[in-house]
Amino acid sequence: MPRLPPALRLLQPPLRCWVVPKLHVSAKPARTPTSPAEQAVGLSMMFLSFLVPAGWVLSHLESYKKSSTA
Protein backbone atom coordinates (compact mmCIF):
# COMPACT_ATOMS: atom_id res chain seq x y z
CA MET A 1 0.00 0.00 0.00
CA PRO A 2 2.87 2.50 0.34
CA ARG A 3 3.02 2.69 -3.49
CA LEU A 4 -0.54 4.01 -3.84
CA PRO A 5 0.07 7.73 -3.02
CA PRO A 6 2.84 8.15 -5.66
CA ALA A 7 0.61 6.49 -8.24
CA LEU A 8 -2.21 8.86 -7.36
CA ARG A 9 0.17 11.82 -7.70
CA LEU A 10 0.85 10.75 -11.29
CA LEU A 11 -2.85 11.02 -12.10
CA GLN A 12 -3.39 14.43 -10.51
CA PRO A 13 -1.53 16.74 -12.97
CA PRO A 14 -3.57 15.71 -16.05
CA LEU A 15 -6.79 16.19 -14.12
CA ARG A 16 -5.79 19.73 -13.16
CA CYS A 17 -5.15 20.66 -16.80
CA TRP A 18 -8.63 19.79 -18.02
CA VAL A 19 -10.64 22.97 -17.84
CA VAL A 20 -14.27 22.69 -18.85
CA PRO A 21 -15.61 25.94 -20.32
CA LYS A 22 -18.74 27.38 -18.78
CA LEU A 23 -21.86 27.03 -20.92
CA HIS A 24 -23.78 30.09 -21.99
CA VAL A 25 -27.26 28.91 -21.13
CA SER A 26 -29.99 31.51 -21.09
CA ALA A 27 -33.23 31.17 -19.20
CA LYS A 28 -34.86 33.89 -21.27
CA PRO A 29 -37.50 33.04 -23.87
CA ALA A 30 -36.60 33.32 -27.54
CA ARG A 31 -36.69 36.79 -29.09
CA THR A 32 -38.77 35.60 -32.02
CA PRO A 33 -40.80 32.47 -31.26
CA THR A 34 -40.85 29.81 -33.96
CA SER A 35 -44.27 29.24 -35.49
CA PRO A 36 -45.71 25.73 -35.83
CA ALA A 37 -45.37 25.98 -39.62
CA GLU A 38 -41.66 26.79 -39.33
CA GLN A 39 -41.20 23.90 -36.92
CA ALA A 40 -42.98 21.52 -39.31
CA VAL A 41 -40.85 22.62 -42.26
CA GLY A 42 -37.64 22.33 -40.27
CA LEU A 43 -38.53 18.91 -38.90
CA SER A 44 -39.55 17.58 -42.31
CA MET A 45 -36.30 18.86 -43.86
CA MET A 46 -34.30 17.11 -41.14
CA PHE A 47 -36.09 13.81 -41.80
CA LEU A 48 -35.77 14.17 -45.57
CA SER A 49 -32.06 14.91 -45.35
CA PHE A 50 -31.56 11.49 -43.74
CA LEU A 51 -34.24 9.42 -45.45
CA VAL A 52 -33.80 10.44 -49.10
CA PRO A 53 -30.13 9.37 -49.39
CA ALA A 54 -30.84 6.13 -47.52
CA GLY A 55 -33.80 5.41 -49.80
CA TRP A 56 -31.69 6.10 -52.87
CA VAL A 57 -29.04 3.63 -51.78
CA LEU A 58 -31.60 0.98 -50.87
CA SER A 59 -33.47 1.35 -54.16
CA HIS A 60 -30.24 1.01 -56.19
CA LEU A 61 -28.71 -1.74 -54.07
CA GLU A 62 -28.99 -4.40 -56.78
CA SER A 63 -27.19 -2.24 -59.33
CA TYR A 64 -24.44 -1.57 -56.80
CA LYS A 65 -24.05 -5.31 -56.23
CA LYS A 66 -23.85 -6.01 -59.99
CA SER A 67 -21.29 -3.29 -60.67
CA SER A 68 -18.99 -4.36 -57.82
CA THR A 69 -18.78 -8.01 -58.98
CA ALA A 70 -18.10 -7.17 -62.64
Swiss-Prot record:
- Mitochondrial matrix-side positions: 25-35
Q: Which InterPro entries match?
A: Cyt_c_oxidase_su8, Cyt_c_oxidase_su8_sf
The biological processes this protein is annotated with in GO are: mitochondrial electron transport, cytochrome c to oxygen
Once renumbered to this chain, the transit peptide range reads 1-24
Q: Which GO terms describe its cellular component?
A: mitochondrial inner membrane; respiratory chain complex IV
Record keywords, A-Z: Membrane, Mitochondrion, Mitochondrion inner membrane, Transit peptide, Transmembrane, Transmembrane helix
What ranges are annotated Mitochondrial intermembrane (topological domains)?
A: 60-70
Membrane topology annotation: Single-pass membrane protein
Transmembrane stretches, start-end = 36-59
Per the record, the coiled-coil ranges are none
Superkingdom to which the source organism belongs = Eukaryota
Quote the subcellular location field of this record: Mitochondrion inner membrane
Pathway per its UniProt entry is:
Energy metabolism; oxidative phosphorylation
Q: Which Pfam families match?
A: COX8
Q: What does this protein do?
A: Component of the cytochrome c oxidase, the last enzyme in the mitochondrial electron transport chain which drives oxidative phosphorylation. The respiratory chain contains 3 multisubunit complexes succinate dehydrogenase (complex II, CII), ubiquinol-cytochrome c oxidoreductase (cytochrome b-c1 complex, complex III, CIII) and cytochrome c oxidase (complex IV, CIV), that cooperate to transfer electrons derived from NADH and succinate to molecular oxygen, creating an electrochemical gradient over the inner membrane that drives transmembrane transport and the ATP synthase.
Oligomer and partners: Component of the cytochrome c oxidase (complex IV, CIV), a multisubunit enzyme composed of 14 subunits. The complex is composed of a catalytic core of 3 subunits MT-CO1, MT-CO2 and MT-CO3, encoded in the mitochondrial DNA, and 11 supernumerary subunits COX4I, COX5A, COX5B, COX6A, COX6B, COX6C, COX7A, COX7B, COX7C, COX8 and NDUFA4, which are encoded in the nuclear genome.
Question: Would you identify the family this protein belongs to, as annotated?
Answer: Belongs to the cytochrome c oxidase VIII family.
Question: What's this protein's name?
Answer: Cytochrome c oxidase subunit 8B, mitochondrial
Q: Which gene encodes it?
A: COX8B
